Amino acid sequence: MSPKVQALIFIVGLITLLAAHAQEELSDNIESERGCSGAYKRCSSSQRCCEGRPCVCSAINSNCKCRKTYTELFKEYFGK
């Protein structure tokens, strides 16, 4: 392969890697700006759970926490 083709492939790969990393950081920033709570964090009517997780409260409607979905638990148990 010529050096020009190798350089082009390297540059395209680097741009792809950087774009994927930037997308991950952007999605994390959007969720934190939105004010949502992660798994096993406190939640309320004003502080929703991220990623559509359910907000589960105790019997007297206190100590509410975000729980993982069944899909997330299944993926953790059986691997991705």
UniProtKB/Swiss-Prot annotation:
<dbReference type="GO" id="GO:0005576">
    <property type="term" value="C:extracellular region"/>
</dbReference>
<feature type="propeptide">
    <location>
        <begin position="23"/>
        <end position="34"/>
    </location>
</feature>
<feature type="disulfide bond">
    <location>
        <begin position="43"/>
        <end position="55"/>
    </location>
</feature>
<comment type="similarity">
    <text>Belongs to the neurotoxin 02 (plectoxin) family. 05 (U19-lycotoxin) subfamily.</text>
</comment>
<protein>
    <recommendedName>
        <fullName>U19-lycotoxin-Ls1b</fullName>
    </recommendedName>
</protein>
<keyword id="KW-0800">Toxin</keyword>
<dbReference type="InterPro" id="IPR004169">
    <property type="entry name" value="Spidertoxin"/>
</dbReference>
<feature type="signal peptide">
    <location>
        <begin position="1"/>
        <end position="22"/>
    </location>
</feature>
<keyword id="KW-0960">Knottin</keyword>
<feature type="disulfide bond">
    <location>
        <begin position="49"/>
        <end position="66"/>
    </location>
</feature>
<keyword id="KW-0732">Signal</keyword>
<dbReference type="Pfam" id="PF02819">
    <property type="entry name" value="Toxin_9"/>
</dbReference>
<dbReference type="GO" id="GO:0008200">
    <property type="term" value="F:ion channel inhibitor activity"/>
</dbReference>
<dbReference type="GO" id="GO:0090729">
    <property type="term" value="F:toxin activity"/>
</dbReference>
<feature type="disulfide bond">
    <location>
        <begin position="57"/>
        <end position="64"/>
    </location>
</feature>
<keyword id="KW-1015">Disulfide bond</keyword>
<keyword id="KW-0964">Secreted</keyword>
<feature type="disulfide bond">
    <location>
        <begin position="36"/>
        <end position="50"/>
    </location>
</feature>
